[in-house]
Amino acid sequence: MLILISPAKTLDYQSPLTTMRYTLPELLDNSQQLIHEARKLTPPQISTLMRISDKLAGINAARFHDWQPDFTPENARQAILAFKGDVYTGLQAETFSEDDFDFAQQHLRMLSGLYGVLRPLDLMQPYRLEMGIRLENARGKDLYQFWGDIITNKLNEALAAQGDNVVINLASDEYFKSVKPKKLNAEIIKPVFLDEKNGKFKIISFYAKKARGLMSRFIIENRLTKPEQLTGFNSEGYFFDEDSSSNGELVFKRYEQR
């Protein structure tokens, strides 16, 4: 079983590391090509392209400039400990045991605009390059064309290595669009998280993102390997709704706190 999650815009390179072990990203030759393209952009161009403030554009221009192909614990940190968005608030990888990291390294993958696919312990230098950004490159008009089949092929390698054919899609639509389902040697299961608001159940972005992290942690902590085991997920008040689930979608609901 292979879990897919999105990266985060918020990064943490200050907190103490909870594991010293690391691996290197497997698609760095591709990353270097994107960095080459990104370095051509001025801060104002970055601001327009990414729809971010001038200050953030300056920070990211510096990140592109400072990026180098030699990754060490001095200039990079493990991806699962560097990302700090809503998904990662639910995941809480900073509290993982070494055995948890081992299981995650085999069963969890982070999709990335710059790195393509990251394993949890892959070192990562800081960046911001969302998958949906239209960064023109030698392979096309955006990152989807740049990555082509590369991400899908890498996921197929991971599935083959564990002798399995199930993908748990906990990534956002923006990131899962970089995967080609018809070329993926897997059954795709998509958990959906609905929160009650004024008597109606709907996707509330912040809660749904955190729930994706909670589900990832649930799978890792309990060493789950079969999709039917996911229905036992009950973190922070969520429960499985079989009647609402169908066609590879597992629906989980949570009542509003009264």
Curated annotation (Swiss-Prot):
Cystine bridges: none
Transmembrane parts of this sequence: none
GO cellular component term of the entry, any: cytosol
Domain of life, source organism: Bacteria
GO BP of this protein: response to hydroperoxide
Pfam family of the protein (one): H2O2_YaaD
PANTHER family associated with the record: PEROXIDE STRESS RESISTANCE PROTEIN YAAA, PEROXIDE STRESS RESPONSE PROTEIN YAAA
HAMAP family documented for this protein: UPF0246
Family: Belongs to the UPF0246 family.
Name of the protein: UPF0246 protein YaaA
